[in-house]
Amino acid sequence: MTAILERRESESLWGRFCNWITSTENRLYIGWFGVLMIPTLLTATSVFIIAFIAAPPVDIDGIREPVSGSLLYGNNIISGAIIPTSAAIGLHFYPIWEAASVDEWLYNGGPYELIVLHFLLGVACYMGREWELSFRLGMRPWIAVAYSAPVAAATAVFLIYPIGQGSFSDGMPLGISGTFNFMIVFQAEHNILMHPFHMLGVAGVFGGSLFSAMHGSLVTSSLIRETTENESANEGYRFGQEEETYNIVAAHGYFGRLIFQYASFNNSRSLHFFLTAWPVVGIWFTALGISTMAFNLNGFNFNQSVVDSQGRVINTWADIINRANLGMEVMHERNAHNFPLDLAAVEAPSTNG
């Protein structure tokens, strides 16, 4: 008997690298999207931490009145933020090498653009990596589709809104009080609370929280009893056991009697699709609403008050909202302009002399 030994050619370094990147045996899957995700998110995180601690004040309104946002310049965790790039920069791409010096780059809020653009690229790649790992494992792609909702929301406030408004200075600041300031100004300028897409987002988030709590508590309560009536049902289970502990028939029966029969799912896949779709679709709509309001297609307005036969205004809640919006609008960027756009649009009276 003759044995023929064939010498295998050793795999190239590039081939081994490709196999390692796409291997599902790694403790953490990297993937081709991960090759871009890792450096972009590390960059965004590193610059965020450094800037939050030590960045000098930024001339956000482009009027030579810098606003402090970092901890070393007098802020705390609540008031601190990465201040958006200056209105003097607008939508220009503003990397470090475009500035005359690092001091100028910091003064004009360069870190904000750097963080936001790297962050958006990173989370988009994270979404792609979710799809990629699902594909390698033969799974369906809906995990990445669900994650597209927060990605769309982040893209709306950090990129689409500044594009629509003409400047990165209108983007959401990266901090707690900065986020609230963004929300208040957004309401003042766009009446977002009266936009149907925002209403759908509120229903999606609050409804999703309710359904998640209902589902979790129902599953936790619907135990397959392994014990007698004289001892606790909890005694029949070990934490993390492999055996099934949840009886969907019992859960369906309970919930069907608590509300009514057809309010309860008897199919696990239908139930979990609903739990996924409700908040995801709601947040999609909110992101779409932000993206349309970016171009000043705003929420409903009731600028024409209700009047009686004598022409006197009959105050409604709409008038209260209008007055609140005007109050918020005159208070923001108060040194950049003297009047909000609503008031400044009125033709000035002529004067004699």
Curated annotation (Swiss-Prot):
<dbReference type="GO" id="GO:0009772">
    <property type="term" value="P:photosynthetic electron transport in photosystem II"/>
</dbReference>
<keyword id="KW-0157">Chromophore</keyword>
<dbReference type="InterPro" id="IPR005867">
    <property type="entry name" value="PSII_D1"/>
</dbReference>
<feature type="binding site">
    <location>
        <position position="215"/>
    </location>
    <ligand>
        <name>a quinone</name>
    </ligand>
</feature>
<keyword id="KW-0106">Calcium</keyword>
<keyword id="KW-0359">Herbicide resistance</keyword>
<comment type="subunit">
    <text>PSII is composed of 1 copy each of membrane proteins PsbA, PsbB, PsbC, PsbD, PsbE, PsbF, PsbH, PsbI, PsbJ, PsbK, PsbL, PsbM, PsbT, PsbX, PsbY, PsbZ, Psb30/Ycf12, at least 3 peripheral proteins of the oxygen-evolving complex and a large number of cofactors. It forms dimeric complexes.</text>
</comment>
<dbReference type="GO" id="GO:0009635">
    <property type="term" value="P:response to herbicide"/>
</dbReference>
<feature type="binding site">
    <location>
        <begin position="264"/>
        <end position="265"/>
    </location>
    <ligand>
        <name>a quinone</name>
    </ligand>
</feature>
<dbReference type="GO" id="GO:0010242">
    <property type="term" value="F:oxygen evolving activity"/>
</dbReference>
<feature type="transmembrane region" description="Helical">
    <location>
        <begin position="29"/>
        <end position="46"/>
    </location>
</feature>
<feature type="binding site">
    <location>
        <position position="344"/>
    </location>
    <ligand>
        <name>[CaMn4O5] cluster</name>
    </ligand>
</feature>
<protein>
    <recommendedName>
        <fullName>Photosystem II protein D1</fullName>
        <ecNumber>1.10.3.9</ecNumber>
    </recommendedName>
</protein>
<feature type="transmembrane region" description="Helical">
    <location>
        <begin position="197"/>
        <end position="218"/>
    </location>
</feature>
<keyword id="KW-0148">Chlorophyll</keyword>
<keyword id="KW-1133">Transmembrane helix</keyword>
<keyword id="KW-0793">Thylakoid</keyword>
<feature type="binding site" description="axial binding residue">
    <location>
        <position position="118"/>
    </location>
    <ligand>
        <name>chlorophyll a ChlzD1</name>
    </ligand>
</feature>
<feature type="transmembrane region" description="Helical">
    <location>
        <begin position="274"/>
        <end position="288"/>
    </location>
</feature>
<feature type="binding site">
    <location>
        <position position="215"/>
    </location>
    <ligand>
        <name>Fe cation</name>
    </ligand>
</feature>
<feature type="modified residue" description="N-acetylthreonine">
    <location>
        <position position="2"/>
    </location>
</feature>
<dbReference type="Pfam" id="PF00124">
    <property type="entry name" value="Photo_RC"/>
</dbReference>
<feature type="binding site">
    <location>
        <position position="189"/>
    </location>
    <ligand>
        <name>[CaMn4O5] cluster</name>
    </ligand>
</feature>
<keyword id="KW-0464">Manganese</keyword>
<comment type="function">
    <text>Photosystem II (PSII) is a light-driven water:plastoquinone oxidoreductase that uses light energy to abstract electrons from H(2)O, generating O(2) and a proton gradient subsequently used for ATP formation. It consists of a core antenna complex that captures photons, and an electron transfer chain that converts photonic excitation into a charge separation. The D1/D2 (PsbA/PsbD) reaction center heterodimer binds P680, the primary electron donor of PSII as well as several subsequent electron acceptors.</text>
</comment>
<feature type="binding site">
    <location>
        <position position="342"/>
    </location>
    <ligand>
        <name>[CaMn4O5] cluster</name>
    </ligand>
</feature>
<dbReference type="GO" id="GO:0009523">
    <property type="term" value="C:photosystem II"/>
</dbReference>
<feature type="binding site" description="axial binding residue">
    <location>
        <position position="198"/>
    </location>
    <ligand>
        <name>chlorophyll a PD1</name>
    </ligand>
</feature>
<feature type="site" description="Cleavage; by CTPA">
    <location>
        <begin position="344"/>
        <end position="345"/>
    </location>
</feature>
<dbReference type="GO" id="GO:0009535">
    <property type="term" value="C:chloroplast thylakoid membrane"/>
</dbReference>
<keyword id="KW-0472">Membrane</keyword>
<keyword id="KW-0479">Metal-binding</keyword>
<feature type="propeptide">
    <location>
        <begin position="345"/>
        <end position="353"/>
    </location>
</feature>
<keyword id="KW-0602">Photosynthesis</keyword>
<feature type="transmembrane region" description="Helical">
    <location>
        <begin position="118"/>
        <end position="133"/>
    </location>
</feature>
<keyword id="KW-0813">Transport</keyword>
<feature type="binding site">
    <location>
        <position position="333"/>
    </location>
    <ligand>
        <name>[CaMn4O5] cluster</name>
    </ligand>
</feature>
<dbReference type="InterPro" id="IPR055266">
    <property type="entry name" value="D1/D2"/>
</dbReference>
<dbReference type="GO" id="GO:0016168">
    <property type="term" value="F:chlorophyll binding"/>
</dbReference>
<feature type="binding site">
    <location>
        <position position="332"/>
    </location>
    <ligand>
        <name>[CaMn4O5] cluster</name>
    </ligand>
</feature>
<dbReference type="InterPro" id="IPR036854">
    <property type="entry name" value="Photo_II_D1/D2_sf"/>
</dbReference>
<dbReference type="GO" id="GO:0016682">
    <property type="term" value="F:oxidoreductase activity, acting on diphenols and related substances as donors, oxygen as acceptor"/>
</dbReference>
